[in-house]
Amino acid sequence: ADPGQQNKPDAWKNLSFDELKEAVHKYTYDVLYRLKIMDCAPDMVQIGNEIRSGMLFPDGAVPQYRQLAALVNEGIRAVRELLPETKVMIHLDQGGRYNCIMPWFDSMFNAGMLPIDAIGLSFYSFWHGTFMDLKDTMSRLIKLYNLPVYIVETAHPWRHCKGDHISKELMETAGLDAGSAEQKKSLEIIMQIAAEVSKDTGKTGVYYWEPVGVPGKGMGTWFENMGMFDEHGRALPGWDAIRDFDPKNPPIKELDKYIESLYEYEETPEVEDFMKLLMIHGNLISNPEFKDGFNNWQIETSLEEGQYTLGKDGVFISSDANFDYSISQTVDIEYTGEYIAAVDYRGTNTTGVEVELFMDVEDESGVHTYTSDIFPDDIRFVTHLLKPVRLQKNARVTVGLRMHTPPVFAKIKKISLVVI
């Protein structure tokens, strides 16, 4: 399960809500009982996995917080009944984004969620904000809820992926590039952050997902570069970071200053060239920066109107539930030539986020679609380009942005179409 995948098991698909609650309680109790009789009772139990969008859809999908709280409570009760000494954790993604985490916990406690013993966060630097965002989020959560906070999922690629799961473009938002030394440094930073912010509670931890993932046939793209062993099964330097870490003698001096130095950006030559073309030839999109509202734009979405609004930075989209969103404009091409589409986009990222810039072309030869995946960056607006497309005179072209995503926020500043 992750924020985009929280469906019920097939065996539970037709249960009533009361039956579903009973099934959660029984399943949790039975699994823990088997562990207990084998003398393997856990010290801590996490109810659900990355449940910021909910769990057991559709019954427990956010924003149905009361129903979600009722389901979570059945898991908590099962733990308390069988293993009263075992701690209970709730685990969310977006570890570097306090404004995603705090409202969720407030909503759940207000909806009747039972007391818990710890907060667990996922933090992947290429999805979940900067390292400083992580430090700020952990500090504020500890202070607000008086609970220890753990990093229960993290990883960093030890090489660039042969597939496209963790691309070079995505790693541009991570502060550190892919590499075995960078994996070690990422772990040092995260462990030092956790230790520093948890001095008063004295309780924290960092868990790597998944250290024993070794590249191999049928293992999937995550294991191409996210484990802590290389393709020959040799341990990577990241293990040294774990073995040698001492909170009393941390590896990084002046941590905040070091983190700040990691995030320096320059526009790519391709974007610089595009900006020059935009100034020379102009934008074929009407109302490209939404100064005239949504005039000339077509929108298709599962969101309510209040969840996508206009502000000084263009379109702002925010949802606490999974959603689809598409915004586009159709242009008739007057001259044959090569054209580039672009979008200035800023937004949060996590597991299951799908955002793409697209161009649908209708001409004498038929209908053609061109797309470019966007890897969101919530630190700044990034200009994303579609590779040049040759368009014929009288072609009808639709340019826009599509989103299919778990709960995130997004900003669309400008959409462009320029002839080369």
Regions found by a protein language model. Give the residues of each.
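Feature marks short, surface-exposed loop/turn motifs that line or immediately flank catalytic pockets
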Residues: 1-2, 51-55, 96, 125-127, ...
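Extracellular and organelle-lumenal recognition/adhesion modules and their flexible linkers in secreted
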Residues: 255-420
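A cross-domain feature marking catalytic cores of carbohydrate-active enzymes
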Residues: 1, 47-49, 90-94, 121-123, ...
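Glycoside hydrolase catalytic-domain groove-lining segments
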Residues: 85-87, 100-172, 188-196, 200-202
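Aromatic-rich peripheral "rim/lid" segments of glycoside hydrolase catalytic domains that contact
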Residues: 2, 63, 136, 140, ...
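Active-site cleft segment of glycoside hydrolase catalytic domains centered on the general acid/base Glu
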Residues: 3-110, 114-116, 128-138, 144, ...
